[in-house]
Amino acid sequence: MTDLKLAWRAWKTRYRDQVFELRAIRQALRGGGVALDVGANKGSYLYSMARWAGSSPVVAFEPQRTLARYLAGACQRAGLRNVTIENLGLSDRAGELDLFVPGDSHSPGASLEASIAEKTDCHKESVTVTTLDLYAVENLKGPVRVIKIDVEGHELAVVQGALGLIRRDKPLLVIECEGRHMPAGKTVQEFIALVVSLGYTATLAMPGLGELPAADFRDELHQKRAGERFWDAKDYYNNFIFRPTGAAS
């Protein structure tokens, strides 16, 4: 038994949209290990991560209540018994924060960054947040092998709240990062430099082309903001793969 929508999203992600990201995740999970899906949304990565993790736990964090409930049901229908769904946001501190959600329902563009509300109509939900370091101490056993992060501009805070875990376990990191979502005064290049300083090499995933060394990333070239839905353009790239220095690519 499976959830057809979840399986279809997983197929599209693995074989069309995020080929290089999923390939790296599969390699990192050989032999098992904990995997974390931060900003799981509707589970595009989750199905594959759960299968490849074997008997190891996979934890998905989704602060939108409707989507967290959906994921819990979808994983149950798909028989993904090693998956835990946490209706939590992740940040650099624990507490309560406002989640800004475009439109009047759930959205893949929901963010803990208030600046998103300056660009589009949003409604607010108060959500519980914690840090990955705190969560790991209280809930995780065994090394973390993979962390995927898609949090619409809040990735810097998520990484800052996970520095202990990252330094200890050196997991593969797959992180969406876009200049249009970065906090004021911050750049994609600065974010890349921070993660690289933790002992990583970085590449930009370019569907259909390959992986570009992240040092060659140029905002004006790889994330051009031309047209109404520029983020959907085939030559717009926003996923970075961070491998521990010395790991095979």
What annotation goes with each model-predicted range?
Residues 1-249:
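Phosphate/nucleotide-binding beta-alpha loop and adjacent structural elements of enzyme active sites
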